[in-house]
From Swiss-Prot:
This is EEF1AKMT4-ECE2 readthrough transcript protein. The active site is at E719, D782. Disruption phenotype: Eef1akmt4-Ece2 and Ece2 double mutant mice are fertile and healthy, and do not display any abnormality in terms of growth or aging. Residues 1-160 are annotated as: Methyltransferase-like region. Inhibited by phosphoramidon. Zn(2+) binds at H718, H722, E778. PROSITE patterns: NEPRILYSIN, ZINC_PROTEASE. It comes from Mus musculus. PANTHER family: EEF1AKMT4-ECE2 READTHROUGH TRANSCRIPT PROTEIN-RELATED, ZINC METALLOPROTEASE FAMILY M13 NEPRILYSIN-RELATED. Expressed at high levels in central nervous system. Expressed in adrenal glands, ovary and uterus, and at low levels in heart.
Amino acid sequence: MASPRTPVSPPELPEKNFQYRQVQYWDQRYKDAADSGPYEWFGDFASFRALLEPELCPEDRILVLGCGNSALSYELFLGGFPNVTSVDYSPVVVAAMQVRYAHVPSLRWETMDVRALDFPSGSFDVVLEKGTLDAMLAGEPDPWNVSSEGVHTVDQVLSEVGFQKRTRQLFGSHTQLELVLAGLILVLAALLLGCLVALWVHRDPAHSTCVTEACIRVAGKILESLDRGVSPCQDFYQFSCGGWIRRNPLPNGRSRWNTFNSLWDQNQAILKHLLENTTFNSSSEAERKTRSFYLSCLQSERIEKLGAKPLRDLIDKIGGWNITGPWDEDSFMDVLKAVAGTYRATPFFTVYVSADSKSSNSNIIQVDQSGLFLPSRDYYLNRTANEKVLTAYLDYMVELGVLLGGQPTSTREQMQQVLELEIQLANITVPQDQRRDEEKIYHKMSISELQALAPAVDWLEFLSFLLSPLELGDSEPVVVYGTEYLQQVSELINRTEPSILNNYLIWNLVQKTTSSLDQRFETAQEKLLETLYGTKKSCTPRWQTCISNTDDALGFALGSLFVKATFDRQSKEIAEGMINEIRSAFEETLGDLVWMDEKTRLAAKEKADAIYDMIGFPDFILEPKELDDVYDGYEVSEDSFFQNMLNLYNFSAKVMADQLRKPPSRDQWSMTPQTVNAYYLPTKNEIVFPAGILQAPFYAHNHPKALNFGGIGVVMGHELTHAFDDQGREYDKEGNLRPWWQNESLTAFQNHTACMEEQYSQYQVNGERLNGLQTLGENIADNGGLKAAYNAYKAWLRKHGEEQPLPAVGLTNHQLFFVGFAQVWCSVRTPESSHEGLVTDPHSPARFRVLGTLSNSRDFLRHFGCPVGSPMNPGQLCEVW
């Protein structure tokens, strides 16, 4: 449930300043505001988040003094700080807040005078207040010569909660008087701002500036993210995000932080509340399974007590591991079937069931390259540059082997052999930028033909085990992506010693399962992640890890809880309307392309018309019987987290087998409803926008349309344009991989994409160039999505007229569209994480998703007046759509 957000007018000020100290004034004020939303003094939680989070841990007991009807306490809860007590000496507002947030039991509300707090000593770790101490000083006759009584009152409150020492640590050696004066300056600044707003409204009877609470709030967020010291034509990313970057240092334990991470943290807090406070008596069985799974993950004491035993027992059951004890030397196929079949690890290759790209109405077995633990083959092959990572990885392998019972010296020797095998795998793995032409890498063959291609594996035996109880024969069709890779893998298996093969297979199982074991395994992984991504050990609570695990295991059952509690059905209708507006704008662009012939243009328009959109969630999650059917057969217990994970792997294999003889279903989403993301699926020609992304800053019903089109509108345009990027354009309107372009148009398309590939290949991060080919599809989608969304916004303006501008930001609504787009991508990353993104991510880094796209936008250059030759207007524009 979201915090109430009805617009709030500025409150009536008391006749005399000292009335701020009288409970009668506040009681009357809150009675008058009974139907209004929260009123925030000096800003909301987001305004101070960057300052607060370094001082807070999720376990902190927080006291909020003088809470009023602010949403601060609830927003702290949503931000991952659930233990909040709020006090105010107006019983009227306390009663109102108890009712408003009755659905959040961890929030406590007390009627209390801050000058006489009735809490035991040591009850709180952190104390927050916004203006309460200033209000206590409101009766001072001379704000520049505060009376000793006034200073004593402030000091008394701080001492009462044991906060005085911490305050001095935060503010150094400043005197109490200096601290009080600092507070008074904030009050005066707030009053001055109020006067300026009132003066503006008075001088402009037409109220041309939007002064609703939503407009004021979002204007504040935009302003605090901007860096006005940078010209927008010099560096628009820094102009739009410089303030945000200063205010958002990387949280502990994170290698990157951005809007997506922030929203996912917020969604996790909501899911935590739902799992811990929902009465599941009338829920579906699938929803009850989410709670049982989540609780099993939270049982840290039991997990610690079991230690490594669950995995050691599993290894023994499979046939042993040469690193830790006896093993069966003739068991390669049996171990491969167990590791890759029963427990769904991916040594050497990955096997899955999905829609046939050339016959999208049917599912087919598919085989592709896999088998590397590190994020990219580059980490194995560029050994000089990645020596630290390879050393840390080997140390991690050895530490886990020893934790599972191996001897340090022999474990290191054998793990070195496993690492060398992975390096050989990396050598034959095809780089992602060489796999972009799906027509070239798609190879359909029978199992018998696959057997001839890669004879080291008994494919009929393996696939029959994997897809049991289905009966397969030698003629069963299979799609292989990368025949040369599989051929070389087969040769690699044949020339590798059986003991090394066994160690490698079991190592894949160990990688898959150690996250379900005790803290020692987590600590070992943290050391590797620090080297790989630059992360530091964090105080990330166990519940947050468990929410992610529950989402992975039972994401759609969890999504049912999330959607019922948070999703506004009106958002779905509005999103549908926006998609249609953006589709129309894209199709108008198709009509203007001079390089496309008429036959290809008509087929492209038909494909755009045929794109199917899915908004919010699949319908089945709100039908208890259908939802239960999805997870029927998955056994979940509160007693064993490790066994729940093993059951999940086995269950997913059965689900995969069940899909093979069925046609693909539109209800089968690739993302759960709470996910903060979106995607395009070419074999269904569909775009999907989960509920998790349909919220601010991407979308809010009371935000200016300029921001909504610049936020979720660009995301919608991006996903729609994927249907026509260098890979999506190979699929027709039915989702089938086939050539449907005329040769002349295809040649022209490739010339335009070559410009974009070259453009992005010139950008650098920490002296390392982007791969313009690897990121080509996403760059095409970014550029096309921005153009379609902006054209849709212009069409909306023609129909509805100009919007009121936001106060204080000094931007036209057209400029606001581009700032809104850019601020969605404000981001901070460690250097290690930035490198990992360059070698693995098909997206460009956030900075260049903004700079690259806008420097190609004629509309942006016109509205910001960037002259040719300025950094944002280099003179040559790359346009595809």
